[in-house]
């Protein structure tokens, strides 16, 4: 058994563990006290054995105690997270950095990494690390020391429920965006492919100067404006271990590209 990401004892974990421990200790003490009171009041072997009942009852209550501790600390964590994200938005506004959002059901991390590599040849670029694609992950990247002095910020933007992309757009306010495509990823939370499209397509309404869309989105994009660019599938792309060659078609022009 191996964790994808090594466990870290973050502040949130420590706060949750402390409240969980207090809940467990309090309930255990209460159960022991009640059972002991019954034993003293009524006497007898049966009531004497009741003193040991908490030993069998408490393990069954542990999941519910954890849920209760999480609900209690969640009030504080929600307030703290909201302020953290708000502060990141303020830093965004002051920085003047060019912001690029990457949205889609698949390929976000790969596109983000490729784009960062390409742009880094000319600009100072930072991208959200690994698969950070939620408000807290983006905010953490914005408020990190590595973000200072950067010219371009690339944000991977994910969604598991309705409203997630709108929330991320309000935070990032992308100047440019890439929309890779839609598929049945997270259909368990969205319910249908149409709902997934409706959520992901919020990136088209974010006010970006240009939104580059994958070729698979042609069937979804009924009406577009000049801001939306839909890419064609490359028929002559050649991939090798040391080089890549393809023809880039933009606005009716063909540009041969080799790497």
Predicted regions and their residues:
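Canonical alpha-helical transmembrane segments of integral membrane proteins
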Residues: 20-35
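A generic structural signal for short, solvent-exposed coil/turn residues
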Residues: 11, 94, 117-119, 238-240, ...
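Glycine-rich phosphate-binding P-loop
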Residues: 99-119
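Cofactor-binding loop segments of dinucleotide-utilizing enzymes, especially the Rossmann-like FAD-
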Residues: 105, 130, 214
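A polyampholytic, Gly/Pro-enriched intrinsically disordered region
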Residues: 102, 148-151, 248-255
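Transmembrane alpha-helical segments that serve as helix-helix packing and pore/cofactor-lining elements
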Residues: 2-22, 38-42
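Acidic, Mg2+-coordinating active-site environments of NTP-dependent enzymes
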Residues: 179-259
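ATP-dependent carboxylate-amine ligase catalytic core
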Residues: 1, 34-48, 52-60, 64, ...
């Amino acid at each position: 058994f191996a964790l994808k990401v090594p466990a870290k004892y973050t502040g949130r974990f420590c706060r949750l563990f402390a409240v969980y421990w207090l809940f467990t200790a309090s309930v255990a003490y209460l159960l022991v006290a009640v059972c002991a009171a019954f034993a003293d009041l009524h006497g007898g072997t049966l009531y004497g054995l009741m003193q040991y009942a908490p030993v069998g009852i408490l393990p069954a209550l542990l999941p519910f105690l954890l849920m209760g501790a999480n609900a209690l600390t969640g009030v504080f964590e929600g307030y703290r997270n909201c302020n953290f994200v708000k502060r990141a938005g303020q830093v965004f506004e002051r920085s003047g950095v060019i912001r690029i959002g990457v949205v889609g059901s698949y390929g976000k991390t790969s596109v983000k990494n490729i784009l960062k590599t390409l742009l880094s040849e000319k600009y100072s670029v930072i991208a959200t690390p690994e698969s950070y694609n939620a408000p807290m992950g983006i905010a953490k990247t914005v408020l990190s020391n590595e973000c200072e002095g950067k010219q371009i910020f690339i944000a991977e933007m994910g969604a598991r429920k309705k409203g997630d992309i709108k929330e991320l757009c309000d935070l990032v306010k992308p100047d440019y965006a890439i929309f890779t495509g839609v598929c049945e990823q997270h259909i368990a939370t969205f319910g249908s492919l149409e709902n997934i499209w409706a959520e992901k397509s919020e990136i088209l309404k974010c006010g970006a100067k240009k939104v580059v869309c994958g070729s698979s989105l042609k069937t979804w994009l009924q009406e577009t404006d000049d801001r939306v660019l839909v890419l064609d599938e490359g028929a002559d792309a050649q991939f090798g271990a040391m080089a890549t060659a393809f023809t880039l078609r933009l606005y009716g022009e063909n540009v041969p590209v080799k790497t």
